[in-house]
Every structure is written in structure tokens, then in C-alpha cells.
Amino acid sequence: MFWVISKQGSTAVAEQEETLVFRVPTEDDGKAIWNLINYPGVLDLLSSYSYFMWAKFFDQTSVVGETNEQIVGFYIGLHTTEYGPDTLFYLASCSDETQRQKGLASRMLQAILHRYAWRNIRYLEATVGTSNEAPEALFQKLSRDLKTAYHVTEFFTEDQFPGKGHEDERLFKIGPFQQV
């Protein structure tokens, strides 16, 4: 496996005859991101408009992974000084079922951390529903790879959500870590 990081923020990874390209999303990716998150049917689906807006206004804290010019994964994140100047918070992520168990999510997060603009980031955070086990393994592995701490705390309880059917959300936090 090898990484190529361009000045535009794209990272290419070649592995077993399949090339994955990690790049900054554009507003043109909104539809593909919406389609990807809509397909599994297990994640909270927001309006398509929100994915267009995230890809446009949170592009530098987000990443799409593509192979054969098809988006196969994404992370949408935000960085605000109000929340914490050294923390990236991830709002949404998804990987195509053909890419699961291949380390795509971890590599997308590492691609973001390798971007020159985010070298002052020392923490990653995300909220995850209690039944979604894959992110826990991802954050544990990423914290081991980055040789840093890993914490999980209660964030929102089911009772806080309107209506029925939304489970508790946990806050995953890794860090502090040194520059990647």
C-alpha cells in the first residue's frame, strides 16, 4: 500500500489492483453521498440538501473515498473554535458495503489528519448509536495506531429525542495525538 498526498488534498492508495482516491468533497458530490447513506437503510437520513451543503461548506474537514470514479465512502466533519480549536467532530460517515472490513473508514480519517491544514488537531470525536458496533472497533484501532487515548461516554439518551425509535448516542473521543 502507498499514499500519495497532493497539494489539492487528494490522497491515493493502491492496493490489490484497486485504487482508492481520498479527496476533499465538492458540492457536486452531494447526490452521491446522499445515495450512499440512503442505500444501507440503517443510518439517519437527512434531506439531500444537507449533504450538498456539508460537501460545500465543510469540505476541508470532510473526505470522500472513491474507486473507479464512484464514491464508496465519506466522512463529514466540522471544526469550530467554539467547540474546541484542536478537535474535529464527525457528523456523518458511511462506507459502501463492498468496502466494509477493508479499513476504508480508518484510512479516510487518516487522510484528513494528513492534510497540512489540520496539523493542529489533537482530538477526533463522533457520536454513535449504541447498536452500531463498527465505529467502536474503528476508534479503538485508530487510537492504537496513533498511540493515544480512547474514551466513550454517554452523549444523548433515547428520551431526549422526539418520537420513538432513536437509540442512545455515545460520544467517542480519541486523543490527544501528536502531528500525523
Curated annotation (Swiss-Prot):
Which superkingdom? Bacteria
In what pathway does it function?
Answer: Amine and polyamine biosynthesis; ectoine biosynthesis; L-ectoine from L-aspartate 4-semialdehyde: step 2/3
Please name the InterPro entries in this protein's record.
Acyl_CoA_acyltransferase, Ectoine_EctA, GNAT_dom
Instruction: Give the E.C. number(s).
Output: 2.3.1.178
Q: Which GO terms describe its molecular function?
A: diaminobutyrate acetyltransferase activity
Ranges of residues in domain N-acetyltransferase: 20-180
| Induction of synthesis | By osmotic stress.
Do you know which Pfam families this protein is assigned to?
Answer: Acetyltransf_1 (PF00583)
What is any one GO biological process for this UniProt entry?
ectoine biosynthetic process
Q: Which UniProt keywords apply?
A: Acyltransferase, Stress response, Transferase
Protein family according to the UniProt entry: Belongs to the acetyltransferase family. EctA subfamily.
Name the record gives this protein: L-2,4-diaminobutyric acid acetyltransferase
Q: Which gene encodes it?
A: ectA
